[in-house]
UniProtKB/Swiss-Prot annotation:
InterPro entries attached to this UniProt entry: HD, Homeobox_CS, Homeodomain-like_sf, Lambda_DNA-bd_dom_sf, POU, POU_dom, POU_domain_TF, TF_POU_3
Gene that produces this protein: POU3F2
Organism listed in the record: Homo sapiens (Human)
Lineage, uppermost ranks: Eukaryota, Metazoa, Chordata, Craniata, Vertebrata
Subcellular location(s) of the protein: Nucleus
DNA-binding region extent: 354-413
Protein name: POU domain, class 3, transcription factor 2
C-alpha cells in the first residue's frame, strides 16, 4: 500500500496533482489555530480534478476548518491539508491545552485518488516533529507573499446554498471557499458532528463560530447582499408584527359602534323596568292579555298573555327581554299620557277583553241551588233552564255552578268510601255510575 507523507491530521496528496504547491512558507502555529484574512490567496484554491471521487468516502476527515486552512492545500478542501510544496509543511491543528498534540487519524490519497487508508498516531507524531522546524521558518515568508497576492473576495458562505440541519459539511470550512468552488464542489465537504476541535464544533455538529472575526468584519457585508438571509448573519432581524387584537368570541358587539353598548340594558335595568311596568299596568287597569293585544295592534308584534307574564317575572331570556323592553316602554308612555280619556289603547283593550265579569250569587239563591244539588247532582238541560228562570239567573250561570259543585264533591269524597248520607243522595239517581253505589267502609 503506497502512501505519501501526510501532515498531522490529513494532508491530501495524489499523483494526479490534486493540490497545487505554493512557495515556501509555513502557516501560523498557535493555540487558536486561526489565520488572518491576508493569509488566504486565490492560488490556494485550485480546482479539484475529477479523478474518481476525491473526498468521497463518508468518514473522511475534514482537516481544514476555516480558522486553520493549510498553506497550499486549498484544492483539497479549503486549505484543509496544509502541504506547502506538495509534501506537507505544517499542521493546521492546534495542540491540546495540556501541551500534547491532538492525535486523530489522517487520510492519505493513493495513486488512484482514493483516501480510504488511515494511519495511526505514531507516524503522525514523527511527521509532526519534522514539520514543526520548517513551519517556523516559513511563517513570515508565507504571510508577506500572501498579503501581496490576496484577492478582494475570499469569503464565500457556501452554507447559504445548502441550508438545513441535515447538511454534513462544516460551515467553517465552507466559509473560505471561493464562489466557484462553493457552487460546484460544496457538496464534497463533510464534517464529523461527534468531535470537537478547540470548541469550534459542537456536539451536534453545529459550528460555534463560522470564521475569524477579522474575516467576518471585512467580507460579510458585501456578500450578504448577494445571498439569501442567513440566521447567523442577521441577528437583529425584526420578527413579524403581531396580529391585531380581537375581542372575545362571546361578545359580538366588540367591533360595533361604541354607542351600541349604551343601548343594551343590563340585568338590573331590566329587573327595575319589569317591576315598574307591572305596577303601572295594574294601576291603569290593564291585564297582561290587554298589553299583548295592544302591542300587536299598534306595533305589529303580537304577544300572548303568557309572554307578558314571563317578562314581568323575569323568566325570559336576556335577548328576548332586551327586545321586548322598548316596546313595553313605548306602550307604557302612551298609556300614561292618555290616562283619564278614552284612547285607542282603551278601545283595543275593550275589544280584547273576552273574559266575563265574575258572577256573585246571593246567599238565598245559593241555598236553593244547594238543595236542588242534593236531590239531583246532575240535572238535565230542561231542569237547568227551569231552575234558572225560577231563580232569575242566566242558564250558563246555573250550568257552571252545578259543574263546579260536582268537582267540589269529588274532592271532598275520600278514595275508600263515601260521605255519610251519600247513599240517600245517589241511591235514587238514574245517572249514578256503578262505582258510586253503597260501599261498606273499611273498619
Amino acid at each position: 500500500m503506497a502512501t505519501a507523507a501526510s501532515n498531522h491530521y490529513s494532508l491530501l496528496t495524489s499523483s494526479a496533482s490534486i493540490v497545487h504547491a505554493e512557495p515556501p512558507g509555513g502557516m501560523q502555529q498557535g493555540a487558536g489555530g486561526y489565520r488572518e484574512a491576508q493569509s488566504l490567496v486565490q492560488g490556494d484554491y485550485g480546482a479539484l480534478q475529477s479523478n474518481g471521487h476525491p473526498l468521497s468516502h463518508a468518514h473522511q476527515w475534514i482537516t481544514a476548518l476555516s480558522h486553520g486552512g493549510g498553506g497550499g492545500g486549498g484544492g483539497g478542501g479549503g486549505g484543509g491539508g496544509g502541504g506547502g510544496g506538495g509534501g506537507g509543511d505544517g499542521s493546521p491543528w492546534s495542540t491540546s491545552p495540556l501541551g500534547q498534540p491532538d492525535i486523530k487519524p489522517s487520510v492519505v490519497v493513493q495513486q488512484g485518488g482514493r483516501g480510504d487508508e488511515l494511519h495511526g498516531p505514531g507516524a503522525l507524531q514523527q511527521q509532526h516533529q519534522q514539520q514543526q522546524q520548517q513551519q517556523q521558518q516559513q511563517q513570515q515568508q508565507q504571510q508577506q507573499q500572501q498579503q501581496q497576492q490576496r484577492p478582494p473576495h475570499l469569503v464565500h458562505h457556501a452554507a447559504n446554498h445548502h441550508p438545513g440541519p441535515g447538511a454534513w459539511r462544516s460551515a467553517a470550512a465552507a466559509a473560505h471557499l471561493p464562489p466557484s468552488m462553493g457552487a460546484s464542489n460544496g457538496g464534497l465537504l463533510y464534517s464529523q458532528p461527534s468531535f470537537t476541535v478547540n470548541g469550534m464544533l459542537g456536539a451536534g455538529g453545529q459550528p460555534a463560530g463560522l470564521h475569524h472575526h477579522g474575516l467576518r468584519d471585512a467580507h460579510d457585508e458585501p456578500h450578504h447582499a448577494d445571498h439569501h438571509p442567513h440566521p447567523h448573519s442577521h441577528p437583529h432581524q425584526q420578527p413579524p408584527p403581531p396580529p391585531p387584537p380581537q375581542g372575545p368570541p362571546g361578545h359580538p358587539g366588540a367591533h360595533h359602534d361604541p354607542h351600541s353598548d349604551e343601548d343594551t340594558p343590563t340585568s338590573d335595568d331590566l329587573e327595575q323596568f319589569a317591576k315598574q311596568f307591572k305596577q303601572r299596568r295594574i294601576k291603569l287597569g290593564f291585564t297582561q292579555a290587554d298589553v299583548g293585544l295592544a302591542l300587536g295592534t299598534l306595533y305589529g308584534n303580537v304577544f300572548s298573555q303568557t309572554t307578558i307574564c314571563r317578562f314581568e317575572a323575569l323568566q325570559l331570556s336576556f335577548k328576548n327581554m332586551c327586545k321586548l323592553k322598548p316596546l313595553l316602554n313605548k306602550w307604557l308612555e302612551e298609556a300614561d299620557s292618555s290616562s283619564g280619556s278614552p284612547t285607542s289603547i282603551d278601545k283595543i283593550a275593550a275589544q280584547g277583553r273576552k273574559r266575563k265579569k265574575r258572577t256573585s250569587i246571593e246567599v238565598s239563591v245559593k241555598g236553593a241551588l244547594e238543595s236542588h244539588f242534593l236531590k239531583c247532582p246532575k240535572p238535565s238541560a230542561q231542569e237547568i233552564t227551569s231552575l234558572a228562570d225560577s231563580l232569575q239567573l242566566e242558564k250558563e250561570v246555573v250550568r257552571v255552578w252545578f259543574c263546579n259543585r260536582r268537582q267540589k264533591e269529588k274532592r271532598m269524597t275520600p278514595p275508600g268510601g263515601t260521605l255519610p248520607g251519600a247513599e240517600d243522595v245517589y241511591g235514587g239517581s238514574r245517572d249514578t255510575p256503578p262505582h258510586h253505589g253503597v260501599q261498606t267502609p273499611v273498619q
